[in-house]
């Protein structure tokens, strides 16, 4: 398990897992931003198709509507980033509550008999409990990271498939049937690969949880 998740350890030659998570979340946001723009372009093309191809070529509102939607979506995403960072800082600022098992055991009678032997005998379970708590905390962090990355990757795949569908709709509306069917095929391939993404991350979760349950 340590070798499987050795990339989570800090080091000079290893990228921080937090940086990787932020890159994945940013890429996911960019995918959905692109989907917003392409879907608006497809909707405008369909409306122009209802009026006729000649009006679509001379309609000056198409570009401005598309740019306005992209700018508004970008502002929403940029405004959400400080909120997420503030929530993360508040979560990190909360003091970690750890059980005070060592102090409770230390209050027992150690003075009678052999104090040194009893102190060593009672410190062994305390050290074992501390090691177990550290391992459980590390395992919980790994599980949370797998959940986050799996959700982000699956959401990005859904966004890519929707981009392909919106692009295919736009291409078919403007009369490019060949590229449109290619885009539909790409959307089908991405959709077919979504269960594989879920299976891969569920497999990683089982690898992390299995040693703790045994």
From Swiss-Prot:
Keyword Cytoplasm recorded: no
Cell membrane keyword on record: yes
Membrane topology: Multi-pass membrane protein
InterPro entries the record matches: DUF2561
Keywords: Cell membrane, Membrane, Transmembrane, Transmembrane helix
Bilayer-spanning residue ranges: 23-43, 65-85, 152-172, 181-201
Record region (Disordered): 96-115
Subcellular locations according to the entry: Cell membrane
Pfam families reported for this sequence: DUF2561
Domain of life: Bacteria
Gene Ontology, cellular component aspect: plasma membrane
Protein's name in the database: Uncharacterized protein MT2253
Organism (species): Mycobacterium tuberculosis (strain CDC 1551 / Oshkosh)
